[in-house]
């Protein structure tokens, strides 16, 4: 009997030790997986960035504010204890912004404010939101693979944007020649401005709201459940293979429609 009591008492002591150790570990990591090194106070930290950078890759839950300016600069903003985890690595003309380790929970978002002379490509992975403005040039490639949203305001002749995640894209473009959109995930696109041509391939569930993007020629291919709302001045070439609907504004004189799915095509009277 005494042996059983000793065993039971030993198990209780062991359980208390384990609970205490676990609580200590969680306390050391603030319960959310972040080490308690440094203060929770907000802090800004200047990072180096070269003039040759024109390609940005954003990974993780980091918000990005990117604007055009003659002199490149970069500032990381967040809780002091977390800033060392924000990694900014430049290789040639490519700057990668990412976290060294994953974080379970952020009380306040991490943010990077970046100024560059030119921009050719932006790739977004993860949940960070991006606001981009002031850039112009010949060609822009924009790729979104995560849940982060992107707002882009600029002037490029050729724009190619692809969405394969759940993040939404807001495009404001001035006097472009062609805009090409590829939509595979659940993310939606809102587009405004002017372009000679607009082509869009909708293969996911995300919607395209481009009735404020005035294009001379529009080519829309719907293979998913997403709906498209567009504006065509001269011609509209529409191919519906999915369940998504297409609504065309602008009363274009040249119209070509192919329907193999359950989606409908309508022509707005405006």
Please report, for each region that a protein language model flagged, where it lies by residue.
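Intrinsically disordered, low-complexity terminal regions
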Residues: 1-270
């Amino acid at each position: 009997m005494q042996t059983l009591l000793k065993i039971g008492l030993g198990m209780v002591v062991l359980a208390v030790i384990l609970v205490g150790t676990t609580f200590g570990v969680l306390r050391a990591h603030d319960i959310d997986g972040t080490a308690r090194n440094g203060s929770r106070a907000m802090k800004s930290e200047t990072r180096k960035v070269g003039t040759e950078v024109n390609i940005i890759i954003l990974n993780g839950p980091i918000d990005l504010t990117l604007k055009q300016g003659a002199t490149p600069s970069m500032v990381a903003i967040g809780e002091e204890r977390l800033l060392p985890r924000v990694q900014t690595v430049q290789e040639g003309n490519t700057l990668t912004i990412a976290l060294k380790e994953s974080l379970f929970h952020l009380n306040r978002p991490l943010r990077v404010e970046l100024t560059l002379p030119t921009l050719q490509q932006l790739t977004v992975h993860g949940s960070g939101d991006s606001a981009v403005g002031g850039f112009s040039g010949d060609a822009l490639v924009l790729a979104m693979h995560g849940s982060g949203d992107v707002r882009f305001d600029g002037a490029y002749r050729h724009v190619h944007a692809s969405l394969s995640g759940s993040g939404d894209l807001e495009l404001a473009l001035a006097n472009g020649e062609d805009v090409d959109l590829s939509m595979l995930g659940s993310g939606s696109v809102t587009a405004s401005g002017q372009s000679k041509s607009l082509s869009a391939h909708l293969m996911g569930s995300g919607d395209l709201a481009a009735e404020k993007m005035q294009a001379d020629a529009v080519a829309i291919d719907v293979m998913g459940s997403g709906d498209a709302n567009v504006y065509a001045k001269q011609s509209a070439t529409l191919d519906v293979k999915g369940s998504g609907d297409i609504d065309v504004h602008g009363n274009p004189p040249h119209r070509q429609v192919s329907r193999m799915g359950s989606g409908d095509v309508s022509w707005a009277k405006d």
